[in-house]
């Protein structure tokens, strides 16, 4: 152990020689002693000490104190002297001497100075420490004495990791620690303990400023990057980047980019999984082969994933009509075009080459009204064929017409019934259809129910009219007048009377039939045959009896 000794102290050999010279033969036989108090004191560096030298010799001379320290005689008397030692900075030995009866007697005391360390510092920790690998704690201690009582302790939180004595000056104490997830964010520190308890002073503790450790786990696998293979100019598409087994995921840095264009990513973490989502929007100046890059950085290490992406421009297809609304009989040109490298097909007819338009002509007829023309466009991008379709509708202007198949020219209806005149007109612009009775301004509704009577009988002019002309169809309504209600009522009455008469006649005949036939008399009576009544006889006369 190295002990700090002030430069003003004499070499130990010189002191030994001085003590030997002061001792005279026969000193061991003296019966009086010289006491030095306090004996072997301990005090902090730079402190003061009051020393008393005394003897029981009745004929002692002046007591002297020999020391390299700064001293001052405070008081003295017969057989004693008091001194004050100031600015005691190092260990020292003091010697008191006096002559008693011509002989020199001496007494000594060893002063021990303790000093707290001037610097206790834990060396900086690595910015990031991978979990499962060792790292070294290093504590440096300057100053502090006595070294035999000085111990250095390395701590995690309040847990002791290592306890070692401070040996050299300056002292350096190290400990090897295996990094774990639990060490992330943990404070590490260094503490010195100067144990002066055996000297009755106590335990003096100095602690360094703590240093925080950050541990991490970064898998060797790259992130999973989900991005489109193709992206059209001025369109957007979501991009996702995910990495599992990351710790601490919340402290990872994510960089997402389309080429040299950094994407604004939203980063979320759940447990040890990190997910970054961004929207990639392609610019016109990025057309061609590009890369989507996802870069995850943690603990000074990086994991990266890349995906190829092609930015393309797909204009069209655009379908045009020379006349969107064409008169019947006119010539209409239909054309379809798209961007460069795009192959277009118009109503099944392909263009001569990619990038060229497709055309067709037609003579507009009534059947072409509302006809749709379809154009398909195909673009090849890195071996993939992309398709788009477009269409346009042609309107043809033609005069009004009435469909004879749906509008009967002769109608035979009964009086006082409800019917619908089913007639439809067509044309572009759509015509107005009216049916007026000849010789009058009477109009019958078309397409809605109405009540028919004999006044509707006659010939009607059904006319469809528009800005393109007029079309007339003759419709004849034949209304059958119904017979009088008296005849069926009279017939019903006669039938009723006939039925009643027949019923009464049948009832009479049935009753008379019950009254005719033979009668039975009592057994004691004489049997008399009945005779028929003569027509000339009265109803009340009895028949004559034979004598």
Swiss-Prot record:
Residues of the Ig-like C2-type domain: 46-103, 132-197, 234-301, 329-382, 416-469
- GO molecular function terms attached to this record: integrin binding
Which parts of the sequence lie on the Extracellular side of the lipid bilayer? 30-485
By its UniProt entry, which Pfam families does this protein fall under? ICAM1_3_5_D2, ICAM_N
Q: PTM details?
A: Upon stimulation by a physiologic stimuli becomes rapidly and transiently phosphorylated on serine residues.
Q: Which domain of life is it from?
A: Eukaryota
Q: Which key words tag this protein in UniProt?
A: Cell adhesion, Disulfide bond, Glycoprotein, Immunoglobulin domain, Membrane, Phagocytosis, Phosphoprotein, Repeat, Signal, Transmembrane, Transmembrane helix
Q: Which GO terms describe its biological process?
A: cell adhesion; cell-cell adhesion; phagocytosis
InterPro entries membership: ICAM (IPR003988), ICAM1_3_5_D2 (IPR048679), ICAM_N (IPR013768), ICAM_VCAM (IPR047012), ICAM_VCAM_N (IPR003987), Ig-like_dom (IPR007110), Ig-like_dom_sf (IPR036179), Ig-like_fold (IPR013783)
Signal sequence interval, chain numbering: 1-29
Q: List the disulfide bonds.
A: 53-96, 57-100, 139-190, 241-294, 336-375, 423-462
Q: What CDD domains does the entry give?
A: Ig, IgI_N_ICAM-3
Positions glycosylated per UniProt: 52, 84, 87, 101, 110, 134, 206, 264, 295, 308, 320, 363, 389, 453, 457
PROSITE patterns, per the entry: IG_LIKE
**Where's it found, cell-wise?**
Membrane
Q: What does it do?
A: ICAM proteins are ligands for the leukocyte adhesion protein LFA-1 (integrin alpha-L/beta-2). ICAM3 is also a ligand for integrin alpha-D/beta-2. In association with integrin alpha-L/beta-2, contributes to apoptotic neutrophil phagocytosis by macrophages.
According to its UniProt record, which protein family does this protein belong to? Belongs to the immunoglobulin superfamily. ICAM family.
> What is annotated about its quaternary structure and interactions?
Interacts with moesin/MSN.
Name of this chain's protein: Intercellular adhesion molecule 3
Identify the coding gene: ICAM3
């Amino acid at each position: 152990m190295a002990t700090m000794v002030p430069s003003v102290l004499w070499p130990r050999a010189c002191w030994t020689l001085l003590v030997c010279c002061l001792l005279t033969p026969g000193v061991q036989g003296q019966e009086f002693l010289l006491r030095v108090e306090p004996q072997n004191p301990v005090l902090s560096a730079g402190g003061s000490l009051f020393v008393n030298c005394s003897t029981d010799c009745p004929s002692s001379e002046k007591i002297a104190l020999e020391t390299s320290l700064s001293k001052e005689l405070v008081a003295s008397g017969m057989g004693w002297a008091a001194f004050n030692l100031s600015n005691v900075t190092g260990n020292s030995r003091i010697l008191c001497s006096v002559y008693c009866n011509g002989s020199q007697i001496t007494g000594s005391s060893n002063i021990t100075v303790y000093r707290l360390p001037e610097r206790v510092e834990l060396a900086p920790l690595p910015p990031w420490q991978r979990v499962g690998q060792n790292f070294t704690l290093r504590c440096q201690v300057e100053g502090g004495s006595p070294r035999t009582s000085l111990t250095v302790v390395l701590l995690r939180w309040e847990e002791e990791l290592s306890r070692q004595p401070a040996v050299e000056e300056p002292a350096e104490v190290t400990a090897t620690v295996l990094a774990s997830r639990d060490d992330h964010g943990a404070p590490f520190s260094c503490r010195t303990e100067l144990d002066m308890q055996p000297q009755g002073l106590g335990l003096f503790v100095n602690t360094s400023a703590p240093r925080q450790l950050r541990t991490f786990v970064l898998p060797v696998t790259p992130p999973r990057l989900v991005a489109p293979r193709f992206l059209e100019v001025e369109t957007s598409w979501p991009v996702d980047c995910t990495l599992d087994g990351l710790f601490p995921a919340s402290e990872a840095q994510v960089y997402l980019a389309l080429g040299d264009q950094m994407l604004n990513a939203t980063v979320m973490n759940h447990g040890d999984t990190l997910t970054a989502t961004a929207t990639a929007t392609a610019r016109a100046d990025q057309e061609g082969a590009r890369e989507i890059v996802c870069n995850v950085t943690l603990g000074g290490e990086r994991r990266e994933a890349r995906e190829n992406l092609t930015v393309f421009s797909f204009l069209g297809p655009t379908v045009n009509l020379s006349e969107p609304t064409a008169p019947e009989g006119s010539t209409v040109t239909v054309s379809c075009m798209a961007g460069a490298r795009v192959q277009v097909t118009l109503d099944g007819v392909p263009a001569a080459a990619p990038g060229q338009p497709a055309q067709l002509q037609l003579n507009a007829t009534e059947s072409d009204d509302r006809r749709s023309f379809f154009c398909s466009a195909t673009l090849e991008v890195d071996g993939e064929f992309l398709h788009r379709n477009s269409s346009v509708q042609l309107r043809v202007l033609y005069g009004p017409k009435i469909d004879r198949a749906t509008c009967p020219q002769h109608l035979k209806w009964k009086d006082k019934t409800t019917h619908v005149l089913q007639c439809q007109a067509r044309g572009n612009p759509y015509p107005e259809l009216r049916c007026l009775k000849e010789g009058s301004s009477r109009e019958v509704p078309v397409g809605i129910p109405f009540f028919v009577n004999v006044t509707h009988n006659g010939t009607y002019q059904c006319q469809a009219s528009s800005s393109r002309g007029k079309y007339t169809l003759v419709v004849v309504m034949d209304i059958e007048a119904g017979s009088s209600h008296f005849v069926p009522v009279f017939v019903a009455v006669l039938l009723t009377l006939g039925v009643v008469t027949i019923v009464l006649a049948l009832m009479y005949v049935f009753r008379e039939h019950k009254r005719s036939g033979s009668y039975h008399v009592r057994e004691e009576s004489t049997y008399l045959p009945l005779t028929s009544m003569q027509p000339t006889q009265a109803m009340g006369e009895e028949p004559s009896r034979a004598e």
